[in-house]
């Protein structure tokens, strides 16, 4: 009886996959069996939480969260990772707030970065579509959905009512964009803010602007939150960030990743290596001392991170072991000479 039920279930699953594509249904315990091409996110923990080692090509991604939580930092890291493997990145700056010096600190080659500062939401989305259609751009970041103001609203009077205009614009644009993106190798990343729904008594009052279309069309939705400050003495030097994968169509969702974002330099690779290395017992921690094999890395987390920063070979050796443990590809990270701003 059980075998028959199992057979019937397998048949139903294979029929669903034939009709709606691989990954339309999966067991939560499954590891991602999809063979997808990815671009790393710049955070080892997040690559692991996504289940496939990064963000998948030919898909739409949404990164949302409160202000100053690290959304743009994460998106810029994705551009830097795409450039490291020889790709091209584009940044559609609807907020007119891109800081080139900060982008350079994160490892983005700003000389090769394509930047657009569109006047209207329509223009921003048409530029994105044209770049995807070209097939020559690996990652396109749109910052942010809230700043994609429809032309009618810009040209209208101050007090005019424009209910639902932005949602309609997003819905129309995403229908086209989703089609061309899925046939391409491009990743389209939308950065979104959070809004409070008025008068919500039960459930989550938080919502994202731009209507519901993006929630449907996004393959992956990442909820980015600042958890804590990172201090050195009395000085705040960074923030501990938590990213929750609230939607994932290519691997089981609801996984979480925590990592350090250091002010002025972005996601701390050394912090990730230290945390994951300790969790996997590759790095030993006794009291506040961290050690690897017979090498003392330092007392306290920040000191151990500094040691790994100065001793790149040891950091790379530990990272390789972590990646092997999670079956992630290892790209030797070259620190580009122009990626360091004194």
Swiss-Prot record:
Which PANTHER family would you find in this protein's record? MITOCHONDRIAL DNA REPAIR PROTEIN RECA HOMOLOG-RELATED, RECA
Gene3D superfamilies associated with the record: P-loop containing nucleotide triphosphate hydrolases
- Name the positions where ATP binds: 65-72
User: Which family is it part of?
Assistant: Belongs to the RecA family.
Q: Describe the function of this protein.
A: Can catalyze the hydrolysis of ATP in the presence of single-stranded DNA, the ATP-dependent uptake of single-stranded DNA by duplex DNA, and the ATP-dependent hybridization of homologous single-stranded DNAs. It interacts with LexA causing its activation and leading to its autocatalytic cleavage.
GO CC annotation terms, alphabetical: cytosol
InterPro entries annotated for this entry? AAA+_ATPase, DNA_recomb/repair_RecA, DNA_recomb/repair_RecA_CS, P-loop_NTPase, RecA-like_C, RecA-like_N, RecA_ATP-bd, RecA_C_sf
Q: Which CDD domains match?
A: RecA
Q: Which GO terms describe its biological process?
A: DNA recombination; DNA repair; SOS response
One Pfam family, short name? RecA
Task: Note whether tRNA processing occurs among the keywords.
Answer: no
Name this polypeptide is given: Protein RecA
What keywords would UniProt list here? ATP-binding, Cytoplasm, DNA damage, DNA recombination, DNA repair, DNA-binding, Nucleotide-binding, SOS response
The taxonomy runs: Bacteria, Bacillati, Bacillota, Clostridia, Thermoanaerobacterales
Q: Which SUPFAM superfamilies match?
A: P-loop containing nucleoside triphosphate hydrolases, RecA protein, C-terminal domain
Which GO-annotated molecular functions does the record name?
Answer: ATP binding; ATP hydrolysis activity; ATP-dependent DNA damage sensor activity; damaged DNA binding; single-stranded DNA binding
Database matches in PROSITE patterns: RECA_1 (PS00321), RECA_2 (PS50162), RECA_3 (PS50163)
């Amino acid at each position: 009886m059980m075998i028959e039920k199992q057979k019937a279930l397998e048949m139903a699953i294979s029929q669903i996959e034939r009709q709606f594509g691989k990954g339309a249904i999966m067991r939560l315990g499954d590891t991602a069996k999809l063979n997808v091409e990815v671009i790393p996110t710049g955070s080892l923990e997040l690559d692991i939480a996504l289940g496939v080692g990064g963000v998948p090509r030919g898909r739409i991604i949404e990164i949302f969260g409160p202000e100053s939580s690290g959304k743009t930092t994460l998106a810029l890291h994705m551009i830097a990772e795409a450039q490291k493997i020889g790709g091209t990145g584009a940044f559609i700056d609807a907020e007119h707030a891109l800081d080139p010096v900060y982008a350079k600190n994160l490892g983005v080659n700003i000389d090769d970065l394509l930047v657009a500062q569109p006047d209207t939401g329509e223009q921003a989305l048409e530029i994105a579509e044209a770049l995807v259609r070209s097939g020559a751009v690996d990652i396109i970041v749109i910052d942010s959905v809230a700043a994609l103001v429809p032309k009618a609203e810009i040209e209208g009077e101050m007090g005019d009512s424009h209910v639902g205009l932005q949602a309609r614009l997003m819905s129309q644009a995403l229908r086209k964009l989703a089609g061309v993106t899925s046939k391409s190798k491009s990743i389209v990343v939308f950065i979104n803010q959070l809004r409070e729904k008025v008068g919500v008594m039960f459930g989550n009052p938080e919502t994202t602007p731009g209507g519901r279309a993006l929630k449907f069309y996004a393959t992956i939705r990442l909820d980015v939150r600042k958890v804590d400050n990172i201090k050195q003495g009395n000085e705040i030097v960074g923030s501990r960030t938590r990213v929750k994968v609230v939607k994932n169509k290519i691997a089981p969702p609801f996984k979480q990743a925590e990592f350090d974002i250091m002010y002025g330099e972005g996601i701390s690779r050394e912090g990730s290596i230290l945390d994951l290395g300790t969790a996997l017992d590759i790095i030993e921690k006794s009291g506040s001392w961290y050690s690897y094999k017979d090498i003392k890395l330092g007392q306290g987390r920040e000191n151990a991170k500094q040691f790994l920063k100065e001793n790149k070979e040891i950091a790379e050796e530990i990272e390789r072991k972590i990646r092997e443990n999670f079956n992630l590809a290892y790209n030797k990270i070259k620190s580009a000479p122009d990626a360091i701003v004194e």
